[in-house]
């Protein structure tokens, strides 16, 4: 390869890299997942997580519906945060009232993969089987999972560490998610 050709290829690489560099610094995208029929205690936790995410400049991703999703969205929206709801139905109006940006999928629970793939970290607050599927997807994709009163996993090998970072408060959940993103 001639030096002229090498210089041209190097220039193309630089241009391509520059083309994919965001103009603005993107806010971290953190998903909050959890059950639709949650206890008051879990709903308070979820609302606190949403509030903490907004205060720290993160975008909250959620399923956009009721329960933990709505509580987290409410907490985030009430302090001016951005809430993106990945809605399982094909209608934007199905999203809860606190969702800033509804993304309609018409995919039912299949939208769980979109929530997880779009997140840099996942905070699970409580959870039913849908939450369990999202946790499993995140772990398989090596996306950090922070657990606030959520599923506990058991393996045959007791020396293997828990793949979920366990916390007991909303602030600790957001701290752990931000740390996982920055590590």
PLM region spans:
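Glycine-rich beta-alpha loop segments
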Residues: 16-84
